[in-house]
Amino acid sequence: MSSKYIVIEGLEGAGKTTARNLVVETLKSLGVTDMTFTREPGGTVLAEKLRSLVLDIKSVGDEVITDNAEVLLFYAARVQLVETVIKPALARGEWVIGDRHDLSTQAYQGGGRGIDRQLLATLRQAVLGDFAPDLTLYLDVDPRIGLERARARGELDRIEQESLDFFNRTRARYLELAAADPRIITIDACQPLEAVSHDIRATVTRWVQEQQ
C-alpha cells in the first residue's frame, strides 16, 4: 500500500495525543511500520521557532500579534514542515501521522478569529496547492470540557487562553468543514475513553482496509 498522510485535529483537551497513540497502534497491527510523526505549528527547527513566537504569550513581550500576522506565521511554519519533512517522508514510502494541519487554521483563524474565508483560501492555495491529508480524524469535544482538561494539564498557551466564545466559534467551523469533506471523519470525544478508543481503532481499520 502506498504511503498516506493522516492528521488528528480537535480543540484543546480533545485527546489528540491519546488518539495519535491509538492510530499508531492500529496501523502497526495492520502491518504499517514506517511512520513519521509531525506537529503543527512546529516539526522543524525553523517551524519550532515560529511555534514559540505564535503560542508563547511572553515571546513578544507587550506587543500584540495581529490576527493577520498570526495566520501568516502559521502558514510559514506549515510550508516549511510540508516541504522539508512531510513530502520527503511520503516520497520515501513512509506514513505520516500529524498533530494538526491546515484544518486547524481554517477553524481557529477562520472560525475563532473570523478571518475572511477568501483570504484563507488564497493563502492555502499559495502555500499548499492541492496537497492535503488522505484522512483527518476530528475529535469533537464540548469547549467547556476541553478547556477544563487543558487547564488540568498546566499553564495555557496564548491561544488556549482565548474566551469560551472563541472556542465555540472554532468548534462550529470544525463541524461545518468536517460535514463538507468526506476525508474528514468526526469522532465524538465527549464519550468515555473506552468508547473513543473503540471508534478510533474501528475508523482507522476500516479506512485502511478500504485503501487496499
UniProtKB/Swiss-Prot annotation:
<dbReference type="GO" id="GO:0004798">
    <property type="term" value="F:dTMP kinase activity"/>
</dbReference>
<dbReference type="GO" id="GO:0006233">
    <property type="term" value="P:dTDP biosynthetic process"/>
</dbReference>
<keyword id="KW-0545">Nucleotide biosynthesis</keyword>
<dbReference type="InterPro" id="IPR027417">
    <property type="entry name" value="P-loop_NTPase"/>
</dbReference>
<feature type="binding site">
    <location>
        <begin position="10"/>
        <end position="17"/>
    </location>
    <ligand>
        <name>ATP</name>
    </ligand>
</feature>
<comment type="similarity">
    <text>Belongs to the thymidylate kinase family.</text>
</comment>
<keyword id="KW-0418">Kinase</keyword>
<dbReference type="GO" id="GO:0006235">
    <property type="term" value="P:dTTP biosynthetic process"/>
</dbReference>
<keyword id="KW-0808">Transferase</keyword>
<protein>
    <recommendedName>
        <fullName>Thymidylate kinase</fullName>
        <ecNumber>2.7.4.9</ecNumber>
    </recommendedName>
</protein>
<dbReference type="GO" id="GO:0006227">
    <property type="term" value="P:dUDP biosynthetic process"/>
</dbReference>
<dbReference type="InterPro" id="IPR039430">
    <property type="entry name" value="Thymidylate_kin-like_dom"/>
</dbReference>
<dbReference type="Pfam" id="PF02223">
    <property type="entry name" value="Thymidylate_kin"/>
</dbReference>
<dbReference type="GO" id="GO:0005829">
    <property type="term" value="C:cytosol"/>
</dbReference>
<dbReference type="InterPro" id="IPR018094">
    <property type="entry name" value="Thymidylate_kinase"/>
</dbReference>
<dbReference type="InterPro" id="IPR018095">
    <property type="entry name" value="Thymidylate_kin_CS"/>
</dbReference>
<keyword id="KW-0067">ATP-binding</keyword>
<comment type="function">
    <text>Phosphorylation of dTMP to form dTDP in both de novo and salvage pathways of dTTP synthesis.</text>
</comment>
<keyword id="KW-0547">Nucleotide-binding</keyword>
<dbReference type="GO" id="GO:0005524">
    <property type="term" value="F:ATP binding"/>
</dbReference>
